[in-house]
Amino acid sequence: MKLGFISDIHIDRSKTLQETDFLHTLSAYINDQALDEVFIGGDISNHYEKTIAFVEKLQAQSGAKIYFIPGNHDYWEAKSAKKHTLTIHDTFKSHPQSMLNKALIVGNDTAVVGHTGWYNHAYHDPAFTKEKLETGRHKLVT
């Protein structure tokens, strides 16, 4: 079994490349290398719905099994949106391609375990109160 790992592709940050460019390039590479499974280690995009759509399209286009572990950017959404980060986290946890808090046995002696490894240092900010913790919002990052 051939595995691939990549991270921080930020498909929506380029001034010249579109999402389709990333899909085409990654699919071609996956096929050229005959990869069976690919793990994307976060920061796919700056919006959770775009991240999910991208991994679904990449799996369909490449034919390989695509898994992802969301990074801090993947948890974002439009500033005007009111969805709580915990709701986005639950969306990721329930997605079949997400490795969030899951383990996958690969071959006979390897396991891949998904964890964001991300910690919000704003929790140590004195302005971060128990009330803000309960609302799930602090400076648009929790």
Label the model's feature ranges.
Residues 1-4, 103-114, 135:
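Beta-strand-turn-beta hairpins that frame and shape the catalytic cleft
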Residues 1-65, 75-83:
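N-terminal active-site segment of His-dependent metallophosphoesterases
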Residues 26-31, 55-57, 95-108:
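Short amphipathic alpha-helices and their capping/turn segments at secondary-structure boundaries
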Residues 37, 65-67, 97-98, 111:
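Proline-centered loop/turn at the N-terminus of a beta-strand
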Residues 47, 76-78, 107, 112, ...:
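Short catalytic/ligand-binding loop motif for oxyanion handling, primarily in non-cytosolic enzymes
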Residues 78-101:
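Glycine/small-residue-rich loop that forms an oxyanion/phosphate-binding "nest" at active or ligand-binding sites
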Residues 113-142:
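Active-site-proximal loop/helix segment associated with metal-binding centers of metalloenzymes
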